[in-house]
Structure formats: C-alpha cells, structure tokens
Design a protein with these regions (language model features):
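Conserved N-terminal beta1-alpha1 strand-loop-helix module at the mouth
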Residues: 1-93, 106-133, 158, 164-167, ...
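Gly/Pro- and small hydrophobic-enriched strand-loop and loop-to-helix capping segments
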Residues: 91-100, 142-143
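As written
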Residues: 131, 183-185
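Short, solvent-exposed loop/turn segments at secondary-structure boundaries
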Residues: 146-150, 199-200
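Non-cysteine beta-strand/loop elements that form the S-adenosyl-L-methionine
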Residues: 95, 133-140
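A short acidic, helix-capping loop that chelates divalent metal ions and anchors anionic groups
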Residues: 84, 141-146
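Beta->alpha turn/N-cap motifs
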Residues: 138, 191-192
Length: 219
C-alpha cells in the first residue's frame, strides 16, 4: 500500500495507549486494569504476558479481555499474533520489522497489526507499507531500556508531519506526555508509570489525561 500524505483536517485529541507489566496471574491485575480504564480515555491496552505454556497464556488473555473490551478499548497482545484469535484479542503489536513481516498475514484484515521496535525511519515506512494500523516510537527494548527522549520526540514529529497512518509515542513518565502531544502523536503509550503505585493508578490516568490536551493554536 502507498503511504498517504497527512490530511490537513483538524487534529483529534490524542488518546492513551497502556502497556501492562508482564502478567502471570490475571486475577489481581484485572482490578488494576479496570481502575485504569475507568479513569480516562484509553484507546488500547497492550497485554504483555509472562512466560507460560500456550493454554495458560490463552486463559490469561481470556480472563483479562472483558475488563478491556467491555470498556471500549482494544486488547492487543505483545508479540503473540498466533494467540490473538484463540484468546479473543483484537490484534497484536509486533516488535521489529522482521517480526511484523512474519505475522502480518495472520492478522489482516480482521485484526489490528501494530508495528514497533523500529530501528530506523526506513523500517517505520516498511511497516506502514505492509499494512500496519499504527507505528510506535520510543518503546522499551527487551532489556527495558528506552531510546533517548529527544530522538523519540523527533521521530514522532517527522512521522506526524508527513504520514496519515497513526503514530504512538511512548512516554516513560507523565512529564514527557505533553512534548509528544506537541510533536503530533496520535496516541501516547504509558507503561510502568501507570502501574508502579497500585493505589494511585486512577489518579495517574487522570493526570495523564490532563497532559494530553492539545496545545493552543498559534495566533
């Protein structure tokens, strides 16, 4: 598919995209997830699964899916495109262009396919050309290390200026949400910043929502 230039129509307000910690036991986490989703405008939840056999992983997905989908958000799986249909998820987020290319045919056109872990501008464009529903910049690598924020901000700004396909910018903290919004992110992803203090999840989401406000237009 050919990349389309950015539509000059008025920009909608960005939305939140939540990344879970690796989930081993869905029972206690389900309440935390519901608290987060009830507190703000969350478009999608990326479910990261702790290691387990296939049946165990599918059961975890099925246990958490209602908390997400009944609240109008999409449930995406980190990596495991092969479990999307059987677990009742809405799609998968694939890290790296090789993983995305290998999985895209199992997801499209019925399911969401997100492209992340992108090492270069070229990889981002390849993912979009192959059918990505969104691209993500700045997410943690497998060791948990994030790129320098200035590089993420620059990449989001470049993409948002040119391309129609939505872009997600990963924010390590609440303080970096507003710069990503100003750069043009359609969605802002949050991970550990949400789950670090279980008793404060709802307030963290509400505060994140305040940072999502679009900047005032220049006069």
């Amino acid at each position: 598919m050919a990349l389309r230039p950015k539509n000059p129509a008025p920009r909608p307000a960005p939305r939140l995209y939540l990344m879970t910690p690796p989930v081993a036991d869905p029972s206690p986490f389900s309440d935390q997830l519901a608290s987060a989703l009830d507190a703000g405008d969350v478009a999608a939840v990326l479910l990261r699964l702790a290691e387990g056999d296939e049946r165990t992983l599918i059961n975890r997905i099925k246990a958490l899916a209602p908390a997400v989908q009944d609240r109008g958000a999409a449930l995406l799986l980190a990596g495991r495109a092969d479990l999307v249909a059987r677990g009742g998820a809405d799609g998968a987020h694939l890290s790296g262009i090789a993983e995305f290319t290998a999985a895209i045919e199992t997801l499209k056109p019925e399911r969401i396919a997100g492209s992340g872990g992108l090492a270069s501008r070229h990889d981002a464009m390849l993912g979009a050309e192959q059918g990505a529903d969104y691209v993500m910049f700045g997410e943690p690598d497998p060791a948990g290390k994030c790129p320098v924020f200035a590089a993420v901000e620059e990449r989001v700004g470049w993409w948002a200026e040119i391309f129609e396909i939505p872009c997600v910018g990963y924010s390590e903290s609440l303080e970096t949400i507003s710069p990503l919004v100003a750069a043009g992110a359609d969605f802002v992803a949050l991970g550990d910043a949400v789950w670090r203090e279980p008793d404060s999840i709802a307030e963290t989401i509400r505060e994140a929502g305040r940072h999502l406000r679009l900047p005032e237009p220049a006069t």
